[in-house]
Amino acid sequence: MTAAYKTQTQQVSAQFINSNFVRKVTDGRTKEAEAEGTAFIRQKLRQESFAREIIEPVMLADDEIDRDENTDQPKKIVEKEPNSVATFVPFNGSAQRTWFRGMRFAVYFGKTESQRFTKNKFELMTYQNDIRKILSDNSVKDMADQEDTKFTSTINAIVALALSTQRTQAASFNSSAFKIGFQALVNRKQPIGKILMTKSLYYEALDLPATSVGNDVASRHYDLGIEAEEKLWGIPVVSTIKRSIVDDTVGETRRSAYIFSPQNYLGVFFLLQDATLYIEQRADILTFWSYAAPGIGIGNTLSTQRVDFPWA
């Protein structure tokens, strides 16, 4: 009886929220409804985009934006080390990838956008789940995947320029493979910050012997599994289920772990506009979608190392 009562109460609560949400739109209070949905989307996007875990985004004010000398394309000029090479992540609508070798480099802004979600307003009122959560789930996956895909493709382009030094090829997932990758960064005078890999590859750490990770860690893996672990050899690990973005799933040639220097050595992540929900109404039909204007710059191409493992 208690369980049934709880379920019924939750459903009524969700329907009440949805009715209020829809009425705000139909009563002309669209900005309020957009603000509610935007808060959900931004919170979830921070959790879903691994690019945002590696480089923390910074919101730019209007007066911090720089003008391009040839176009109306917004950009941000950033100082960099004179002996380093820099580039930026080319999002939709931004300039083509450029390699900068001077004292400064430009970060150009593009656009990420979700698919459009269209529904009759009366049907929305019958939903048994919070419509704001449904909208955020639909929007966030699209936008986070766009950020992560463009970020990873840029890192791979950097590695491709210096395969002999910025790619470590390993026969199996073991401490020696990562040691060589760590040493490659350190030998270039770059500190070690974070490791990115898929959760599938991360589970290989369960086979690491106690002689590699220590008895306490091996025991913890046995009792709690790898999900309880946030680091390997003291290095924070960002793990993701996005195998199609991180690994070469097309040619099935590699599974990869990316080693990055800390953010102040690696690059910048600017936002002209963070993820924002837009709502459009035409009679009884409501259309929802989200968009953002990010710009990611890699200020030092030496600050990343890719460790490749055989496909499995």
Where are these regions (language model features)?
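N-terminal alpha-helical "arm" segments
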Residues: 1-49
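Sequence/fold signature of self-assembling virion shell proteins
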Residues: 3-6, 23-31, 212-312
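Assembly/oligomerization interface modules of large self-assembling protein complexes
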Residues: 39-113
